[in-house]
Amino acid sequence: MALKDTGSGGSTILPISEMVSASSSPGAPLAAAPGPCAPSPFPEVVELNVGGQVYVTKHSTLLSVPDSTLASMFSPSSPRGGARRRGDLPRDSRARFFIDRDGFLFRYVLDYLRDKQLALPEHFPEKERLLREAEFFQLTDLVKLLSPKVTKQNSLNDECCQSDLEDNVSQGSSDALLLRGAAAGAPSGSGAHGVSGVVGGGSAPDKRSGFLTLGYRGSYTTVRDNQADAKFRRVARIMVCGRIALAKEVFGDTLNESRDPDRQPEKYTSRFYLKFTYLEQAFDRLSEAGFHMVACNSSGTAAFVNQYRDDKIWSSYTEYIFFRPPQKIVSPKQEHEDRKRDKVTDKGSESGTSCNELSTSSCDSHSEASTPQDNPANTQQAAAHQPNTLTLDRPSRKAPVQWMPPPDKRRNSELFQSLISKSRETNLSKKKVCEKLSVEEEMKKCIQDFKKIHIPDCFPERKRQWQSELLQKYGL
């Protein structure tokens, strides 16, 4: 900055750009009209005040993109820049050109104007706002560079740096391999078709499946010096490694994320740990979420010579690896068919059970006069049309149904009599159990039981002294 005398005793503050232009042409006026070979009304070094942030750049840098907003503002040949001149552009109190935009994001716009390349820091959270700034300054190529990345961020809720894209590619390939392995290991049937539909259909993989690893460094500590044998497990911290979405789903608020904050849910981390130190509590949470342990390993930690203590000797590092398989994806139509099939199986098993309870007789009605010996042709025809009878044990829904050959048929009159006799016997037994004896009857029963006790007149001689003393005491 410098002071310029106006001749009337006052002075004005000049920016660096005015000093450069004044030193290059000291005798020329500042607002001279540009002729065909007249110099540019803008200085070679331009000072900008963008949203309170001061930037100093070359005039040629602002004109590097011809169709941009900055080129139209600072180009002397454009209607906006040449006709209005630099005196018409807004300035701040220090005579710097003022642009009312985001001053923090303008540094990336200015970097792009210098070399036409976009270099953003890792985990940059302002991509959408930077896209708006690029659209305002009419930087078409910069908009094209930012648009697919913002779309990727919106669709996957992911950051689009190069390392993040590699993480997404590796994650997608691992999910595809996982689903292929599940499809190869599944038996032929509805389960295999469900998995193959997910892999071949190109739909999104199951985000609920995946691995979680728990690791901890455990040691044993003694209670007191005189109780050296009493050692107890001591766990300083339980580390959690795996996909962030799975870890948050299982552990929730008990997960400490201070060591690796601001990570997207679909990313992986190895820096989370739990707020509690009880392994069994972590196992319970994983079991409730559907995880099961697939592998574990442990190794001892070596101690230095000068730190040869019990807590260093009795220490180890252990890892437990848990896995939750992908869930079976069933269409509504297939689910409806499975329910109908299950209902039919239940009805068949119930009818088979009822037939077996009825003395394993036939469910078809026959007249009393007809017997298997009288008409063997009718018997064979009825046996051909009658389904086999189910066993008493109700089969599971997915297990094959076991059939038994039809039993010999009896007359309905005999069946009716057997049913009546059975019902009477069950009613009598229930009544006997449900009856309660009165107090008088209980006393009579006790007296009768006491009378049944038989005391011998004489007891054999006992060799032991205490036995003979006991008999003499009671005069037996």
UniProtKB/Swiss-Prot annotation:
Location of region: Disordered: 331-412
GO biological process, one term: protein homooligomerization
A Pfam family annotated for this UniProt entry: H1_KCTD8_12_16
Domain BTB span(s) in chain numbering: 44-122
SMART domains cross-referenced by the UniProt entry: BTB
InterPro entries assigned: BTB/POZ_dom (IPR000210), H1_KCTD8 (IPR049904), SKP1/BTB/POZ_sf (IPR011333), T1-type_BTB (IPR003131)
Subcellular location: Presynaptic cell membrane; Postsynaptic cell membrane
List of residues that carry Omega-N-methylarginine: R80
Stretches with biased composition (Basic and acidic residues): 333-349
Origin: domain of life: Eukaryota
Chain intervals with Polar residues compositional bias: 350-391
Keywords associated with the record: Cell membrane, Cell projection, Membrane, Methylation, Phosphoprotein, Postsynaptic cell membrane, Synapse
Assembly and oligomerization: Interacts as a tetramer with GABBR1 and GABBR2.
Task of the protein: Auxiliary subunit of GABA-B receptors that determine the pharmacology and kinetics of the receptor response. Increases agonist potency and markedly alter the G-protein signaling of the receptors by accelerating onset and promoting desensitization.
Protein name according to UniProt: BTB/POZ domain-containing protein KCTD8
